[in-house]
Every structure is written in structure tokens, then in C-alpha cells.
Amino acid sequence: MLSTRFVTLAILACLLVVLGLARGAGGDPGVKQRIDVAREEERRDFWHAACSGHGFPITTPSTAAILFYVSLLAVGVAVACQAYRAVLRIVTLEMLQHLH
């Protein structure tokens, strides 16, 4: 019967062989260099002035202010509804305790 130590060493040796073969089959080093250069160019050209024209423009102060106040109103309504629900549950609980 094989010992667990021998099996562990065999599995480790197989993994090392597979990793060595995978590293050796890396391919042309020029391809990796070209990919790195392309990624560097993409990092430099990430933002462009023409890109800001897409979507919903919020660069004007009036649009940004309207969006801010609508969002603030929505958050305020949500907080008020949750507070009303909490108070209603507390009052209901107190009333049920006084009935019994």
C-alpha cells in the first residue's frame, strides 16, 4: 500500500512538471511585449473629451442641482416612510400590551 507521503510527493512532482511545461510553452515573447504596449496605450488614452458627450449630461449647474435635489427628496421620503413605520410598530406594540 502506498503511503500518503509518497502520494503527496507524486502529486507535487506532477504539478511541478505541468507548471514547467506550461511556462515553457509561453509562446513568442514578442506577442507579450506587443500586448503590454497596447495596454499601456489604452491606459494613456483612457479618457477623451469626445467621450463626455455620451449619456446624461450633468455638467451644467442647473441640471446637476435638479438631479441632486430630486435624489435628496427621494432619500428624505424613504427615511420618513421608515420612521413612520417604526413609530407605528412601536405604538401598535404598546397598544397590544395594554389590551392584555
Curated annotation (Swiss-Prot):
Source superkingdom: Viruses
Job of this protein: Envelope glycoprotein necessary for proper maturation of gM and modulation of its membrane fusion activity. Also plays a critical role in virion morphogenesis.
Positions on the Virion surface side per record topology: 28-63
Assigned protein family: Belongs to the herpesviridae glycoprotein N family.
Species per Swiss-Prot/TrEMBL record: Equine herpesvirus 1 (strain Ab4p) (EHV-1)
Protein name (record): Envelope glycoprotein N
Intravirion domain ranges by topology: 85-100
Residues making up the signal peptide according to the UniProt record: 1-27
Pfam families linked: Herpes_UL49_5
Keyword Membrane attached: yes
Keywords: Disulfide bond, Host Golgi apparatus, Host membrane, Membrane, Signal, Transmembrane, Transmembrane helix, Viral envelope protein, Virion
Keyword Signal: yes
Compartments, as annotated in UniProt: Virion membrane; Host membrane; Host Golgi apparatus, Host trans-Golgi network
A GO cellular-component term linked to this record: virion membrane
Membrane topology: Single-pass type I membrane protein
Spans traversing the lipid bilayer: 64-84
